[in-house]
Every structure is written in C-alpha cells, then in structure tokens.
Swiss-Prot record:
UniProt keyword Hydrolase, yes or no: yes
Organism per entry: Rattus norvegicus
Function: Glycerol-3-phosphate phosphatase hydrolyzing glycerol-3-phosphate into glycerol. Thereby, regulates the cellular levels of glycerol-3-phosphate a metabolic intermediate of glucose, lipid and energy metabolism. Was also shown to have a 2-phosphoglycolate phosphatase activity and a tyrosine-protein phosphatase activity. However, their physiological relevance is unclear. In vitro, also has a phosphatase activity toward ADP, ATP, GDP and GTP.
Protein name (database record): Glycerol-3-phosphate phosphatase
Record-listed Mg(2+) binding positions: D34, D36, D260
Length: 321
C-alpha cells in the first residue's frame, strides 16, 4: 500500500523505510510491543526480531511488552523473551517490562475489591492467572479441569459453590467446560460479583499460519449466559495502558505501539495518542487496513496505523551503522 493510497487529509499507513525509521526512532524514547504474532509465533521467534530488539536496547530505547495472553506470569514472559534471544532484565527486575492481562487483571481486582476482607475470585483461566491474583491477595478457585457432575441440569445446579466469591475472571482456559460456565453464571447471579475478562481476542496466531480460538470466545459465552457485560482489561482497553503508564511514566508523544492486530494493538495506540506500527507477521493485513480507511465509520478509521512493516526486522537497517 503506497502513501498515495492512504487517502484523506492525513496520510497514514505508510511503509516504514529505513530512512523513515531513523527519523521516527529519533523522536521516541519508548517502544511498546505486542508479543504473539509480532515477536514470535508459538515458540518460534520471528526471523530478525531478537536482533532488532537487542539493537533497540543498545540504542538506549526503553521497551515494554503488552500482551493480551493471560497464560503466563510476568516472570514467565520475561524468561521466554530471554530464551528466544530478546534480552531483558534478570534477577529481581525480571518481568518488570512485561504487562500481561494476568498481571493487569490482578491490579484491577486489587483496586475494585479494596476493603473486601479475604477477596476470592472464580477463575476460568490458567495457573498463571491464578498466581498473579494470589500475588495481590486475591484467592483463586476453579482453575483446572471440571467436568459435568450428575445426569442433568438439576444435578449440575446442585454442585456446591465456594462461599464469598466476589469476582468471576475469564482468561484463556483450555479446560473451559459447560460445568465451569454453569458455575460462573451461578456466581454472577449475585449483583455484587464482578465479571472480568482478560481480553476479547477471537483467535490466537500460532506457527505456519495456524490459529486457535481466543479468550474472547470464552468471555462472550459467559456474558451471554449471565446476561452481564464483562469489564475488559486487555487491549484495546485503556486500563492496560494505564498500568504501563503508571509504572513507566510514559510520554505518549514519544512512544510507539507496535502490533499485528488493528482491533487491539493499533486501536489502543490510537486511543492513547501513541504512534503506531502494524507488522504483517500476525493477524491483520493491508486489505484490512484499506477496508478501514475506506469506511465511513470513524471508529474503524481509528484502526489505521501510522506505519506498517512486513516484520519488525525491517527496523534493523535503521539501527545499524
């Protein structure tokens, strides 16, 4: 997509050449990266991505990683970054660059349940999500497999519930089941029980162009069954950016958001007045961008990046020499 194709009064979605990248990097202090589909696919790093991030670190750029994936703790994500060659702090500071929805959901519940003695949450999610909640003092129940008990609805509804559950938290849960859905709805019949979703991604990119169903599918199921709307923590919700901003002291004018999804990464950047770069190694395509550019819907026009690259490795020439 050439610059002339961007249309409108403001030229956007420009290919980020090495020359433009040098100018852009001179204007920014902080780069925020999505992870899945940007830095890696599954357990395989995007070619050239580790070298690019190491070069950015060498130039003194501050890096942050904002991921909607709730299946790992901050520390586990930091370990993956180092294992795949992206570098990063070690020791007590390991994980401080990472802002995942597991960690930020824990911060959200700590705020919302402040003053509640011994707060407890029913978690449809991973042990990592439960661990982040436990780290801020929120007891977690429900993690792991849970099959249907009994022969029918009367038996399912007779299964005892944990007392004093004040929140239902829905993250990525490979053990999601009808039993869990039934329990979640029963907890949410209490009006003071919060419904929190880590993110609304409808699918998760893997290697070789494959995808699996994302957390958003599970959140929607609970919302529909409970007839409640979840508080969403992850991108494009501003809450996750506020978590980063509070810990990093970010100046939006000198910050770039780099991602592969228009409806999460780029929309978050647009909402928070950040510069945005779309990388084509993940979910969204230039055809998706063009559709948003040509739309009469102002909301869709927010999902148009300032720049795009085939891969974040395209930034490397601007960092060499």
């Amino acid at each position: 997509m050439a610059e002339a194709e961007a249309g409108g009064d403001e030229v956007r979605c420009v290919r980020l050449s090495a020359e433009r990248a040098k100018l852009l990097l001179a204007e920014v202090d902080t780069l925020l990266f999505d992870c899945d589909g940007v830095l890696w696919r599954g357990e395989t790093a995007v070619p050239g991505a580790p070298e690019t991030l190491r070069a950015l670190r060498a130039r003194g750029k501050r890096l942050g990683f904002i991921t909607n994936n709730s299946s790992k703790t901050r520390t586990a994500y930091a370990e993956k970054l180092r294992r795949l060659g992206f570098g990063g702090p070690m020791g007590p500071e390991a994980g401080l660059e990472v802002f995942g929805t597991a960690y930020c959901s824990a911060l959200y519940l700590r705020q919302r349940l402040a003053g509640v003695p011994d707060p407890k949450a029913y978690v449809l999610g991973s042990p990592a999500l439960a661990a982040e909640l436990e780290a801020v003092g929120v007891t977690s129940v429900g993690v792991g497999p849970d099959v249907l008990h009994g022969d029918g609805p009367s038996d399912w509804l007779a299964v005892p519930l944990e007392p004093d559950v004040r929140a239902v938290v829905v993250g990525f849960d490979p053990h999601f089941s009808y039993m869990k859905l039934t329990k979640a709805v029963r907890y949410l019949q209490q009006p003071d029980c919060l419904l929190v979703g880590t993110n609304m991604d409808n699918r998760l990119p893997l290697e070789n162009g494959r995808f699996i169903a994302g957390t958003g599918c599970l959140v929607r199921a609970v919302e529909m069954a409970a007839q409640r709307q979840a508080d969403i923590i992850g991108k494009p919700s501003r809450f996750i950016f506020d978590c980063v901003s509070q810990e990093y002291g970010i100046n939006p004018e000198r910050t770039v958001m780099v991602g592969d999804r228009l409806d999460t990464d780029i929309l978050l950047g647009s909402t928070c007045s950040l510069k945005t770069i779309l990388t084509l190694t993940g979910v969204s395509s230039l055809e998706d961008v063009k559709s948003n550019q040509e739309s009469d819907c102002m909301f869709k026009k927010k999902m148009v990046p300032d720049f795009y690259v085939d891969s974040i490795a395209d930034l490397l020439p601007a960092l060499q020499g």
